Curated annotation (Swiss-Prot):
Pfam families: DUF2709. InterPro entries: DUF2709 (IPR024484). This is Protein CPn_0658/CP_0089/CPj0658/CpB0684. Belongs to the chlamydial CPn_0658/CT_538/TC_0825 family.
Amino acid sequence: MDISGAVKQKLLQFLGKQKKPELLATYLFYLEQALSLRPVVFVRDKIIFKTPEDAVRILEQDKKIWRETEIQISSEKPQVNENTKRIYICPFTGKVFADNVYANPQDAIYDWLSSCPQNMEKQGGVRIKRFLVSEDPDVIKEYAVPPKEPIIKTVFASAITGKLFHSLPPLLEDFISSYLRPMTLEEVQNQTKFQLESSFLSLLQDALVEDKIAAFIESLADDTAFHVYISQWVDTEE
């Protein structure tokens, strides 16, 4: 077994933080570094994956993360149309209220003017409700806007919450940050609540054998910085 210098440095940092460094915990930390493992648990399904990317790949295949859906984007109902006979106009913003859209357009424009941010005219500390009125068909036509055809757009919906996303990358980022909980390999080894994804389980079963752990110790023995820890492990074994 050949352990790179970079991994050895990380191992020494790890060992330096432990009050009583244990062989198995050290070996598990080594596996994390050497195999680029970043275990995460998908709590909802109680499954642990070896990396977030692996979790996304497998869960996507099972259609458990997202689904495509269509939404209809339509403009608001026109305020003025061919059936409008009278309009009430806000002189500060140009907002218009049509007699055939509002049951009581005069009350509607009064409500608007009382809170219109551009209406700075006040009398006795109260906003003045000044507005314009027209029944001229040519004036009304100027305010008429033909309705737009609704737009059909494909978006992505979270399979967990139903929340919509414009594109897939932000949905996946949200899934990883919200629904995948990071774990250390030592935590994975010590827990009993969750099952391991099959390829992750096979990887650990293959790595956690006496011959490979012994080869790990032999590789560390080539570096004197690890001798103090190896001595402790050997003494414990004896």
